[in-house]
């Protein structure tokens, strides 16, 4: 029974990723086992950049002037003039057609973020200097505040993360990953890590996604990017790529900021800065997301 369920799980992942045979093989480095994202599939994905370093993090558009990303992407003292956001396109090239570079007006980091590795509150909002036109973007939907997230739900992570040679992906990568139970993730992170003995690693505002065997979903350069799930025919951002121990290591899945815990703060920040409520129009097309959720509810518990 266990092997049969696992076969179903692997087959579904191959269908969703275009039949790639390397979906569960670790070692490549970037979004491990991912594939090039089709044009227009993830229209909210942006690249956070500095003039000196180029691409440093991902992010997601939630409004015509607002980007959601990770707090650890920034350095203190905060200086918005150091940063720009590239909107549109699939590559990191600044000359790519249908893309634009927008200056950042303000940076809002969650007040309790500690500016240290694996800190809670790893979330930030960027206010763009110039509003985007409706033809330039499609915002991702945000979840309801404190919405529960079900382990086993298959979601998607995207980004231009680094390879093991520390090179960035030339084209935006996408990968389907299952959400993991937080207590299971906590136990995994303590395996082989004596320095973590007695310490709580996965905080209540974090969630894990990836593969127990070591097939990590994201790597350096993916930070700040979105983890989205197809829920009620819409793409909902449930996580922000935050941290992990290495890339593609067994028992060290990707850790994400749990977006439902911060929806109230996001709404309050937008309201305090005279922005109307965000609105999304990102429909999850195709039958695969719904099919995957139905079948994985049966197959995944025995396969992982």
Swiss-Prot record:
The protein's pH behavior is summarized as: Optimum pH is 9.0.
Residues with a covalently attached lipid (GPI-anchor amidated serine): 275
Tissue specificity remark: Expressed predominantly in kidney, small intestine and stomach and moderately in thymus, lung, spleen, testis and skin. In the kidney, expressed mainly in collecting duct of renal medulla and cortex.
By what name is this protein known?
Serine protease 30
Q: Which residues form the propeptide?
A: 22-30, 276-304
Give the signal peptide as a residue range, or say none if absent: 1-21
Q: Which GO terms describe its biological process?
A: proteolysis; sodium ion transport
Q: Which residues are tagged as glycosylated in the record?
A: 79, 232, 273
Family indicated by similarity: Belongs to the peptidase S1 family.
Q: Which superkingdom, per the lineage?
A: Eukaryota
Task: List the InterPro entries hit by this protein, alphabetically.
Answer: Peptidase_S1_PA, Peptidase_S1_PA_chymotrypsin, Peptidase_S1A, Trypsin_dom, TRYPSIN_HIS, TRYPSIN_SER
Does Signal count among this protein's keywords? Answer: yes
Biological role: Selectively cleaves synthetic peptide substrates of trypsin. Activates the epithelial sodium channel ENaC.
How the protein is activated or inhibited is described as: Inhibited by aprotinin, leupeptin, benzamidine and soybean trypsin inhibitor. Partially inhibited by PMSF and DFP.
- According to the entry, every stretch annotated as the Peptidase S1 domain falls at 31-271
Instruction: Please name the GO terms that the record assigns under molecular function.
Output: serine-type endopeptidase activity; sodium channel regulator activity
Query: Can you list the disulfide-bonded cysteine pairs?
Result: 57-73, 155-229, 185-208, 219-247
Annotated gene: Prss30
The record ties this protein, via Gene3D superfamilies, to: Trypsin-like serine proteases (2.40.10.10)
A Pfam family annotated for this chain is Trypsin
Q: Top-level EC class, please? A: hydrolase
């Amino acid at each position: 029974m266990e092997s049969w369920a696992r076969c179903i799980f692997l087959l579904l992942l191959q269908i969703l990723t275009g039949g790639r045979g390397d979906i569960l093989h670790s070692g490549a480095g970037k979004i491990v086992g991912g594939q090039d994202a089709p044009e227009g599939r993830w229209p909210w994905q942006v690249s956070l950049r500095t003039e000196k370093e180029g691409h440093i993090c991902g992010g997601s558009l939630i409004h015509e002037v607002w980007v959601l990303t990770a707090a650890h992407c920034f350095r203190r003292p905060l200086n918005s003039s150091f940063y720009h956001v590239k909107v549109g396109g699939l590559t990191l090239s600044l000359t790519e057609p249908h893309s634009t570079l927008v200056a950042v007006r303000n940076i809002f980091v969650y007040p309790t973020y500690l500016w240290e590795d694996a800190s809670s509150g790893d979330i930030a909002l960027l206010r763009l200097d110039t509003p985007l036109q409706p033809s330039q973007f499609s915002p991702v939907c945000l979840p309801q505040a404190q919405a529960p997230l079900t382990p086993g739900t298959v979601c998607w992570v995207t980004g231009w993360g680094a390879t093991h040679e520390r090179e960035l992906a030339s084209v935006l990568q996408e990968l389907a990953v299952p959400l993991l139970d937080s207590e299971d993730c906590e136990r995994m992170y303590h395996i082989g890590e004596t320095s973590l003995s007695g310490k709580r690693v996965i905080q209540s505002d974090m969630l894990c996604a990836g593969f127990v065997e070591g097939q990590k979903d994201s790597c350096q350069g993916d930070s700040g990017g979105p983890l989205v799930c197809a829920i009620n025919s819409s793409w909902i951002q449930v996580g922000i790529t935050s941290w992990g121990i290495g890339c593609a290591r067994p028992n060290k899945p990707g850790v994400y900021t749990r977006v439902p815990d911060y929806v109230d703060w996001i709404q309050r920040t937008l309201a305090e800065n005279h922005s109307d409520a965000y609105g999304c129009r990102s429909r999850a097309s195709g039958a695969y997301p719904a099919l995957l959720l139905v079948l994985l509810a049966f197959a995944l518990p025995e396969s992982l």
